[in-house]
Amino acid sequence: MIAAARARLHHRMLAERVLALRPQRSGGARVVNVADTDNAGSRRVAALLAERIRRQTELPSLLEEIPGERQGASFEHLISDFLKDCLGHMPPSSGSWEVLPGPALDSFAQYRHLRELKRLSDEHEELRLYLGSAYVIRPDIVVARHPMEDEELGVDLIGRGDDLARATFLRKSNAAAHLALPVLHASVSCKWTLRSDRAQNARTEALNLIRDRKGRVPAITVVTAEPMPSRLASLADGTGDIDRVYHVALYELQGAVQDFVTEDPTKGYWEEDLARMVRGLRLADISDLPFDLVS
């Protein structure tokens, strides 16, 4: 099932021209639109990566991107559909899961206090100047976990004492305490590529999710199609503010980098960097993401 969902994702990336060829303003050869056009290595690995994906989809050729298309928004939509597809087939566990595109953080139990904080900052200019807008975060994609009736959880699990387990978000009967809001189980940030500003934005979002919550920290993940190992390392390396970076086609990228190093042995460190991140559990393929989200 995961293999089929991954294959559908790759097919849609090409068929819907999300992963596509981009004409250069200078009139030179078209480049794959995940490449850094100013970096020859990035252009070559992106081309090798796209060709490996194309061969697996059995589409005849890579198409030209749609003029004015926002790859980031299209990428988010594809990843959201992939997660809905996969999580709907994962082994059942306590609570019901829902994949949602970018609701405000104060829609979730751990962050409900941000609603009042926003109201106060709207009313008081000095507070607004002090706080700024760092707390106003809308993750690209979230996985929400909904509270359950006691009957769903099982009387034997809770026992018959009404004075027990009154603070947990998972019990719907605790609605008076937390408005029966869903729990933010995971945040999935979608970054089509990882230029330095995008990597830094992802880190800032992650730190705000950690700092601003009351209760458990959600899983904090990033999905990308970035072809350059050094750019992946800019986000994957670090102290663990992000759980893990997931590549939309890691196995194909590993093959593309191997081919590139065969062509240019001086770039052997590209392959070494990629292997180091995978070995260190900082980088994984998107097929791992559904399992990690429910574990």
Which residues does each predicted region cover?
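Short, conserved, surface-exposed binding loops centered on an aromatic residue
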Residues: 133-134, 176-181, 212-214
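Conserved catalytic cores of phosphodiester-cleaving nucleases, focusing on short active-site segments
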Residues: 141, 184-190, 202
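C-terminal tail/extension regions appended to the core domain(s) of diverse proteins
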Residues: 1-74, 78-92, 97, 212-295
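Active-site-adjacent loop/helix micro-motif of nuclease/hydrolase catalytic cores
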Residues: 151-155, 193-205, 216, 230-233
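Acidic-basic catalytic patches of nuclease active cores, encompassing PD-(D/E)XK
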Residues: 58-162
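Active-site beta-strand-loop-beta-strand hairpin of nuclease catalytic cores
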Residues: 145-186
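A short, acidic, amphipathic alpha-helical segment used as a generic capping/interface helix at domain edges
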Residues: 207-210
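Short, flexible loop/turn elements at secondary-structure junctions
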Residues: 145-147, 191-194, 224-227
